[in-house]
Regions:
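Glycine-rich portal/gate segments that line the openings of hydrophobic small-molecule binding cavities
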Residues: 345-354, 358-427, 440-441, 480-483
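Beta-strand/loop substructures that line and gate deep hydrophobic ligand-binding cavities in soluble
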Residues: 422-471
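N-terminal Rossmann NAD(P)H-binding glycine-rich loop of SDR-like oxidoreductase domains
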Residues: 2-29
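A conserved amphipathic terminal alpha-helix motif
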Residues: 454, 459-500
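Oxidoreductase cofactor-interface core, primarily capturing Rossmann-like NAD(P)-dependent enzymes
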Residues: 20, 27, 119-230, 248-256
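Mid/C-terminal beta-alpha module of Rossmann-like enzyme folds, strongest
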Residues: 195-263, 271-342
Length: 500
């Protein structure tokens, strides 16, 4: 029975917390989110459905207020190696939270920690284990869920794997790529977190949680490459790269900050495999079993593969799948997207600008250097693509699915938005979005975005090599489009002679 029960989620601005909140709401719980900066919660799609309070895990007074009336308290706060004393700060925060939960009369605390299999632990995993021990001694029922690499767009572990695999067709790697790991899909992590709220009160212990696959990091890179449609990677492990040097290497190759990469790399030097699956006694496996690694990667990549990337930069609703990126994820999450964005303001009304936008391409041209577009079309034809020869179906109207030179109309919102998906030969996927919105004093604002999702290292090199030419191809389009709109609006206002 969940109706009316109140859950407190700390760390709601983080990767796990931001995805857990809507799952709790869907399960019928009321949710209160605690943050040092509650205003940062406003950008989440669920912000209007929760209570936001200000609290600091090192401030007992603010925690007691946040925990008032709470049934289940989720502790999802970690110091990711922030300074020499991060372990002490983690211990202090855990003690403060445990004491506040006990005083507030919470019926359960749920903590997501790190999976380990014994032996020598990294500083990162040792700190997680210490936090778990402190919480288990809190005097209230506690569920500690221990997970290794979490597979989902936005997870630091997954983004590190994604960027390394996509950017390096061949690599010399540290020994830890041979460590055995039991990854788990974010969907299954959230299912366990929600299920832990309903554990019987006599259950107070830790549980290992992991997916069905046990793989080395090298295996995960190769399988990611296969799912992403990349060639098999050449991976040569060497014994000379320490975890510290490895984190510098990761920071150089990927956009994941070195301060986040360092503790993660350290934890990968240990074997992280589940020793038990007791959680299934209380939260049974779903029909068909837990999600495997390949399927979890496929879900994480699905948004780009199905051309849903548009929701990342347009006003479309945020997807609800846990594996999807959120608008509050850091910039390095969700895979690489390159964007060329331009804008122009005009006194012409929105309907005049839209007429020009909807009439673009074919015999009407692209409102920039014609030779540049013809050259790009010729290069596409020489490489086996469609080039510019398809033109357009109708000189004035577009509908979803229309061919438009070497583009395909992916979305049309009349008067507001035209999104085109490239069908030219590219090492990746590309979109061109043309949008119109009302401006000041009856005028309008034209926005233009070219977006590229690279496929492997060649895709990154392609974008960087053509970026200098974007000023020629895209630079004049906004100016010329609004000029055409002004001219068209002027013709509309010109009076015509009446009948004589």
């Amino acid at each position: 029975m969940t109706s009316g029960r109140l859950c407190l989620v700390t760390g709601a601005t983080g990767y796990i917390g931001g995805r857990l909140v809507p799952e709790l709401l869907a399960a019928g719980y009321r949710v209160r989110c605690a943050s040092r900066h509650p205003g940062n919660l406003r950008d989440h799609p669920w912000a209007g459905d929760v209570e936001a309070v200000e609290a600091d895990v090192l401030d007992a007074g603010s925690l007691r207020a946040a925990l008032d009336g709470v049934d289940v308290a989720y502790y999802l706060v970690h110091a990711m190696g922030g300074g020499e004393d991060f372990r002490e700060r983690d211990r202090r925060a855990a003690r403060t939270f445990a004491g506040a939960a006990r005083e507030a009369g919470a019926s359960r605390v749920v903590y997501l920690g790190g999976l380990y299999s014994g032996g020598r632990l990294s500083e990162h995993l040792r700190s997680r284990a210490e936090v778990a021990e402190i919480l288990l001694e809190a005097g209230v029922p506690v569920a500690v869920l221990r997970a290794a690499v979490i597979i989902g767009s936005g997870s630091v572990s997954f983004e590190m794997l994604r960027h390394l695999t996509e950017r390096l067709p061949a690599m010399v790697t540290p020994r830890w790529v041979r460590s055995r790991i039991q990854p788990i899909a974010i969907r299954d992590v959230l299912r366990y977190l929600v299920g832990a709220a309903a554990l019987p009160p006599e259950v107070s212990r830790g549980f290992d949680i992991g997916g069905p696959d046990v793989l080395t990091y090298r295996d995960m890179m190769q399988r990611y490459a296969a799912v992403a449609g990349l060639p098999r990677r050449v991976i040569l492990p060497v014994p000379v790269l320490s975890p510290w040097l490895s984190s510098l290497w990761v920071g150089l190759i990927t956009p994941v900050p070195g301060g986040l990469a360092r503790p993660l790399v350290g934890s990968l030097t240990s074997e992280v495999v589940c020793r038990e699956h007791d959680i299934a006694e209380y939260v049974p496996d779903p029909p068909g079993g837990l999600l495997g690694f390949d399927d979890a990667v496929r879900l994480a990549l699905q948004r780009v593969r199905e051309a849903g990337v548009g929701t990342r930069w347009s006003s479309a609703p945020v997807p609800g799948a846990p594996s999807d990126p959120l608008p509050t994820d850091p910039d390095w999450a969700g895979g690489s997207l390159y964007v060329d964005e331009r804008e122009a303001r005009t006194a012409a009304p929105p309907e005049a600008v839209w007429r020009v936008v909807e009439g673009i391409g074919g015999d009407n041209g692209w409102y920039s250097l014609p030779v540049a577009w013809r050259l790009r079309g010729l290069l596409d034809r020489l490489s086996g693509g469609v080039g510019l020869r398809r033109g357009r179906r109708d000189p004035a109207r577009l509908r979803t699915g229309d061919a438009l030179d070497f583009w395909r109309v992916e979305a049309v919102e009349p008067g507001r938005l035209l999104r085109l998906r490239a069908e030219m030969r590219l090492p990746g996927r590309a979109w061109l979005e043309l949008a119109v919105r009302p401006g000041e004093r009856g005028g309008s604002v034209y926005t233009q975005r070219a977006v590229f999702s690279p496929h492997g290292l060649l895709g990154h090199l392609y974008w960087r090599s053509i970026s200098p030419f974007h000023a020629l191809v895209f630079g004049g389009m906004p100016r010329n489009i609004v000029r055409a709109a002004v001219a068209g609006a002027g013709r509309d206002r010109t009076p015509t002679a009446g009948p004589r």
